[in-house]
């Protein structure tokens, strides 16, 4: 199980800028992943994983973060188009972040769209739970997929 944590510094700012510039020059495009969720989503696409587990400080995505009973436990659709429409609808309820420095639920949902279109199931859940309980469905979480 790959564990992605891009925020740990491995190069200084100037090296990072140079790396991105070099990639854009060579390939015409470069994705700059400066968020763990974005990085994990890109890697999920590259390795064609079946399940992407995004760990966070909450049990998943809420319609109202102030109301624990508003946890969205499942997002699905009859096809990938309807699934993405349902994710878009859920994003419309996302405002703010759970802590300073994070990009919040809206960004998590934005980043997982590409893996979802490739058939990956996404689970967004709390790091307080074991990976096994999140994957098995024993722990509360938001599960997104067809």
Name the predicted role of every residue range:
Residues 1-146:
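C-terminal catalytic "cap/lid" subdomain
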């Amino acid at each position: 199980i790959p564990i992605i944590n891009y925020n740990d510094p491995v190069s200084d700012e100037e090296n990072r800028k140079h790396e991105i510039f070099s990639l854009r020059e060579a390939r015409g495009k470069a994705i700059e992943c400066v968020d763990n969720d974005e990085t994990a989503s890109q890697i999920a696409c590259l390795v064609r994983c079946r399940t992407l587990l995004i760990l966070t400080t909450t049990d998943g995505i809420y319609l109202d973060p102030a109301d624990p009973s508003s946890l969205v436990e499942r997002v699905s659709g009859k096809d990938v188009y309807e699934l993405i429409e349902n994710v878009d609808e859920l994003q419309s309820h996302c405002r703010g972040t759970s802590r300073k420095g994070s990009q919040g639920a809206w960004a998590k949902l934005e980043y997982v769209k590409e893996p979802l279109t490739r058939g990956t199931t996404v689970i967004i859940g709390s790091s307080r739970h074991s990976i096994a309980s999140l994957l098995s469905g024993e722990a509360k979480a938001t599960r997104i997929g067809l």
